[in-house]
């Protein structure tokens, strides 16, 4: 997890639920970075969000299990259509045929891939989804550019 830590576990055939060092709140530095960056991107310092980061043995591509709660209920098909219509995102969602995003097949691509879209059985107005994206190809620079393009197109930002 970190060169400064005394224990080092094998990564092959293993998952390590720690990236970086633990903080006083028992989250790791990487988890707090995800939380704080998401709040910053969303311009909402009060956004309720949590994260668990796990070191996994993949060549590349970050993967996230995301849980989103909305103020009002949505139909699953409308949620899927909204995701699919967004530039830079591709739905890859046919679980009955074992089609869903995986790092092995989404690495070295510029888009992010979404699958396993479903209602959260534990909370109304809430959906779960699985997102995979190549952090090298779809990093901060490309993502920022694409967000700015959408903002300009929608009149949310002037040229």
Regions found by a protein language model. Give the residues of each.
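Active-site-lining helix/loop region of Rossmann-like oxidoreductase modules
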Residues: 1-82
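C-terminal active-site/capping subdomain that shapes the small-molecule cofactor and substrate pocket
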Residues: 46-159
